[in-house]
Structures are given as C-alpha cells and as structure tokens.
Design a protein with these regions (language model features):
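Short S/T/G/P-rich N-terminal loop/turn motif that feeds into the first structured element of a domain
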Residues: 2-260
C-alpha cells in the first residue's frame, strides 16, 4: 500500500510539468484544443472531433498510391483540414494513417457531400485510388481534456501511434492512471506526446497516444531508459491493470503531411 501511494504521488507530481510543456509547443488555433480541467473522457463539451483513418493498400500499388495522393491531396484539403498523413513502417505493412479535423458532425456531413460532388476529386483521385486499396477503416475521437495537440519540435523524425484497448468501465475507472502513465513518459523526456485521443465511434474503450521521436534508434534508447525509471514503472504498472491489449505503429510523415 505504501508503494502504491508513492507511485500515485509521483505520477501526480508529473502532471504539472507535462501541462506546462504542452503550452510551449501548442499548435495554432486551427488545431489547438484547450484543456478542460482534469476530466479524462472525450471532450464532448467541445464540438471539435478528429477522424482517424487507416487505409490498407495492395502491396503492388503502395508506391503508386502514395505518388497519386501526393499529387492530388490538395483537392481533398480544399474541403477540410488535414492534420497529418503517415506511411506506416513498423507494426503494419502497406498501410497509411491520417487524421482529419472537424468542427462538428454537421460540418463533416457537408464536407462529405461536397467531396462526393467534386468532379476533380472523383475523377482525378478517387476513381484511381479505390482500386489500389484492400480496406479502409475509420474512428471518431476527441482529444482527452488534459491534453493539447502539439507539433513536433522539428521536422523529420518518426511518429509512433500507440492504441490501447482498455477494459470496460470508462475513464471514470482508468482515466487518471492512464493520464499518469502517459505524462510520466512525456515529462521525463522519454518521447514527445503530440496528442491523446479517446474513441467516440469505432472500437470503444480505446485510446490513442501519438508520439514523436528523433529517429527509430532514439525511440529504442528512450524506451530502455523508461523501463529503468522507477517513477515511470510505477505509473505504468497502475495503468496496465486496466488494459486489455495494445498495438503500436511506427510511421513516417508523407511529404504533403501538415504535421511532419
């Protein structure tokens, strides 16, 4: 019990530096979501949400798909804001992941209708891209209220998307321990947390953490250091008690990605 209290106290002390650090690297107003206290669930008081899309590509068409998207993505971003577009290197093959920002569900519905009626988008991209794909998946997520969306400290580097499937019960059960686990890594310099998201649609009881590292080797080095940090180990130990499973993907930003 004494060890548990110490772990909780250490995790709590780490939250303040993480919040201060978030302020220094915050995105402009178009991408920034304000903190709303220490509630942990989706920011349902905020209408802004993020659509997380995953496309699986035919192995023989990956290069062609990326080339086509690089040339024609401007037709799509004319309708709504793209936050980032990544090519997955580890954790999946022939896969891209992208995040789109919407101010409301009605805005997204309007965008979808406009895109479907955009002849350039349909003929120059969609008709060519769809045959290159094997599947598409999406989720709607909110930033967790204690987190702001941040840019990487510099262009380049690698991005890691870690997705956690939590046990049923919701943020009221596991929210604070999950926050402590993430902020213990971020505040200690074991990675730069760019955003934490909680699914509203798609796989429920799922949260995602988007991280940035200088390169894959640096990420491996920092991970090893984190494993030897008693404060991080204590915070993670409490969080994993509520965890069913998790996956990780290491990604590189595409040339046209706003976040890179």
């Amino acid at each position: 019990m004494l060890n548990l209290r110490c772990a909780l106290r250490s995790a709590a002390l780490l939250r303040a530096p993480a919040a201060a650090a978030a302020q220094s690297g915050a995105l402009p107003s178009s991408g920034l979501q304000p903190c709303a206290g220490l509630a942990i669930g989706p920011q349902q008081k905020q209408s802004t949400f993020y659509e997380l899309r995953t496309y699986n590509i035919r192995p023989d068409q990956t290069a062609a798909f990326l080339k086509l998207t690089n040339e024609k993505i401007h037709l799509r971003t004319a309708h709504s804001e793209l936050l980032g577009f990544w090519n997955v290197e580890y954790g999946a093959m022939n896969q891209v992941f992208h995040i789109w920002k919407y101010d409301s569900y009605s805005q997204r519905a309007g965008v979808r209708a406009a895109v479907a009626q955009d002849p350039s988008w349909v003929s120059d991209f969609l008709s060519k891209a769809i045959p290159m794909l094997t599947s598409q998946d999406n989720a709607v997520a909110y930033l967790v209220p204690w987190c702001t969306l941040r840019r990487p400290p510099q262009e380049g580097g690698v991005f890691e998307l870690v997705s956690f499937r939590m046990r049923p019960g919701g943020p009221a059960v596991w929210g604070h321990s999950f926050q402590a686990a993430l902020t213990s890594h971020d505040a200690s310099g074991y990675g730069k947390l760019l955003g934490a998201f909680h699914n509203e649609y798609g796989q429920l009881n799922t949260v995602h953490a988007l991280w940035w590292f200088e390169n894959a080797d640096k990420r491996a080095e920092l991970r090893q250091k984190a494993h030897n940090d008693a404060r991080v180990v204590a915070a993670v130990r409490e969080s994993v008690a509520h965890l069913d499973s998790q996956t990780a993907r290491l990604m590189y930003a595409c040339p046209f990605s706003p976040m890179k």
